[in-house]
Amino acid sequence: MSVDPACPQSLPCLEASDSKESSPMPVICGPEENYPSLQMSSAEMPHTETVSPLPSSMDLLIQDSPDSSTSPKGKQPTAAENSATKKEDKVPVKKQKARTVFSSAQLCVLNDRFQRQKYLSLQQMQELSNILNLSYKQVKTWFQNQRMKSKRWQKNNWPKNSNGVTQKASAPTYPSLYSSCHQGCLVNPTGNLPMWSNQTWNNSSWSNQTQNIQSWSNHSWNAQTWCTQSWNNQAWNSPFSNCGEESLQSCLQFQPNSPASDLEAALEAAGEGLNVIQQTTRYLSTPQTVDLLLNYSTNMQPEDV
């Protein structure tokens, strides 16, 4: 039979099929009934048919890529986050306002007006803005800033006194006015009259005034005695010279310890006496009276002889 030589021819076919990349091709050697030895050879080598082929590059990529069903899904941004990002993009950047640059002449006029009047009406601000060639808003803003600066300066430079009167005062007083104020004004801020009256009456200046009155009275008495001496020293050739002396002597009868009413009466009497003397001397000093006296004396001499 020619069965044995046919079998060796089938082996190279199997070896050739294993070397290919594709699956092994079936070997057709004829019907199984005619080749009983072929069945045994196929049974002896079952591993050749079950060997898996080498994985290709496409197979590796498919295996490495995760399965969509098993792999976790990537977190997508929510609607709130998207809206927040959109708002941030839409928010415009605030532009800084350009500061107004005032000239030296404008600042001089503004400072002068601020020293005289810190609060201006609408009409006054409009007039001032027209004079300085500025807008109403610029003048208003400058006055507001200047008022804030002055308040801040007063707050920082204000003397930190523990006295509650200065802290509770509604109207601010500057340190120069505060120092010149009398201390008694701060003792009783409510303005009660008893305390004020006690302070004024118990003041040492009242006793000083009484001493000054006594010294003035002594001075007046000394002046009166000096006047009497001067009047006595003068020689008067008129018969009216005794009038002043008598009035002054009557004034000298009062003692220095007499009350003030007697002193005033004495001074008035002395003044009247002096006025009479002055009038008589003026009358006698005129040339008419001198001529009259001379004529009278000449007419009287022959009769006396």
UniProtKB/Swiss-Prot annotation:
Compositional bias segments (type: Polar residues): 65-83
The record's keywords, sorted A to Z, are:
Activator, Developmental protein, DNA-binding, Homeobox, Nucleus, Repeat, Repressor, Transcription, Transcription regulation
| Region Sufficient for transactivation activity, residue ranges | 196-240
UniProt repeat feature sequence, residue ranges: 196-200, 201-205, 206-210, 216-220, 221-225, 226-230, 231-235, 236-240
Q: Where is this region: Sufficient for strong transactivation activity?
A: 241-305
Known function: Transcription regulator involved in inner cell mass and embryonic stem (ES) cells proliferation and self-renewal. Imposes pluripotency on ES cells and prevents their differentiation towards extraembryonic endoderm and trophectoderm lineages. Blocks bone morphogenetic protein-induced mesoderm differentiation of ES cells by physically interacting with SMAD1 and interfering with the recruitment of coactivators to the active SMAD transcriptional complexes. Acts as a transcriptional activator or repressor.
Specify the protein name: Homeobox protein NANOG
Q: Which organism is it from?
A: Macaca fascicularis (Crab-eating macaque)
